[in-house]
Amino acid sequence: IDALLHRVDGILLSGGAALNPLWVGEEPHSALGGINPLRDAFELLLIRRAADHQIPMLGICRGMQILAAALGGKLEQDMTSARPDVALLKHSQNAPRAEATHRVKLLEDSFLGQLLGREIFVNSFHHQAVADTGTQFRAVGFASDGTIEAMESTTFKSILGVQWHPECMDNEDSARLFRHFVQQCASYYRARQWHQHHLSLDSHCDTPMFFDQDIDFNRRDPKILVDAFKMAEGGLDASIMVAYLAQKERTPEAHLAATAKADGILDRLTAMVEHCPSARMAFSPEEVRANKAAGYRSILPGIENGYAFGTDLANVAHYRQRGIVYTTLCHNGNNEICDSARPNALDKERFPATNGAEHGGLSAFGREVVAEMNRVGMMVDLSHAAESTFYDALAVSKVPIVCSHSSSKVLCNHPRNLTDDQLRALAAAGGVAQCTFYCGFLRTDEENATIDDAVAHMLHMIKVAGVDHIGIGTDFDGDGGVPGLASASELITLTRRLQAEGLTDHDL
């Protein structure tokens, strides 16, 4: 099926026979009509895999019902038996198929309500119905007897379902619905073409944090947001996976332990990729390009927290020899290198007069670290760094620096985000800020963050710094991910959204 889906830009699921209730764990009702077992099996799998690939889908009548069944909803095998106390409309009309026989009311705040209006007239040819859309859909259209007549995705996918048969009705409502579906298919095609011919990079991913949970990168593992399958589905060519180190004690013993932990994580990362036939390690842009040309995904290693260096400058060269492409100078809490944007409780206790600021930016050792990173060809990453550290590093570094996973402070006032002045300064120095998708960095009311907020941050950052100085650093598997951008498989949706905002192939 995946081979088929690579050639498909949209799926229209038509009407037809009833769904075999055994597929949804139910015994057949006496009123069950004819079934098509081969079609059931094929479409149930097709829908799930198409949803993983973010392919637009439109379900009509049975098509809406099987969409719901495939993605977690429930059906009424026979509407009359399921709701004996309800005076049902005649849902299997004797009138000609092109004739409308009842009204459907669409929710005002729904997409279909905005596309078609609050009330439309439809035909009807069914005795089964969607009883519960499940969490992946929202019921947005209803007949006067309460029957669900339309549903749409709750996860920002281009998936719609309607219970009536618009293909039989020669009217503007039907034309609008089909035009919209074709437009979504064209949008998906354009994004897929872009990904086939251009490189895409996620500059920050924390999948190694799940090594202790027996993850399998070589299958679609539900425990992680980035694996070989999800990268392929979302069109992601390369991911920088980091060895994350929480900031702990700053004793000689603790520093040695941090270095050993980083080395252990990197060993496991290398082994993970070596056991994946569709991925390869990469340590330079040239290797990423070569891997894509040969049909492989690229995994690049990074370190999140210069705590791994301890107080030994030689560790910088050691980690570059291991292929590390960047090191985030600090995490939450100061270290020997610099001040953090979020000093920890011990920092604030030790330095109450400065609210935890210890070095006033880079320490003397930190300046040596930045210079050594420049020398060995390792990028300096300033995400998590205090603003004072940011400007010190810009002044010290002889080459452009990055902020691998930071968003806009203007749109979300969080100490981890970047001010517009920082974005301009970073761009002036040739650096890049990668917008991140952690909900708390996108909105102060983080529970409401969605792909809409991620797009807003990216567009603002592009406006301030210029399109050449903004990228993406999802923070997937490190608490990054919001509805619409919930895993690597959904990154093609971001491409579609940015193209819809007017970004050209060259911009992207």
Task: Annotate each language-model stretch with its function.
Residues G16-L19:
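Short glycine-rich anion-binding loops that position phosphate/pyrophosphate groups of nucleotides
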Residues R190-P352, N413-I472, F476-D507:
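N-terminal hydrophobic targeting/anchoring segments and the immediately downstream early-domain regions
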Residues P21-N36, C412:
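Glycine/threonine-rich flexible loop motifs
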Residues G59, G63, A68, G72:
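Gly/Ala-rich beta-loop-alpha elbow adjacent to hydrolase catalytic centers
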Residues A50-P56, R297, M378, V399, ...:
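A short helix->loop->beta-strand "cap" motif at the edges of active sites that frequently abuts
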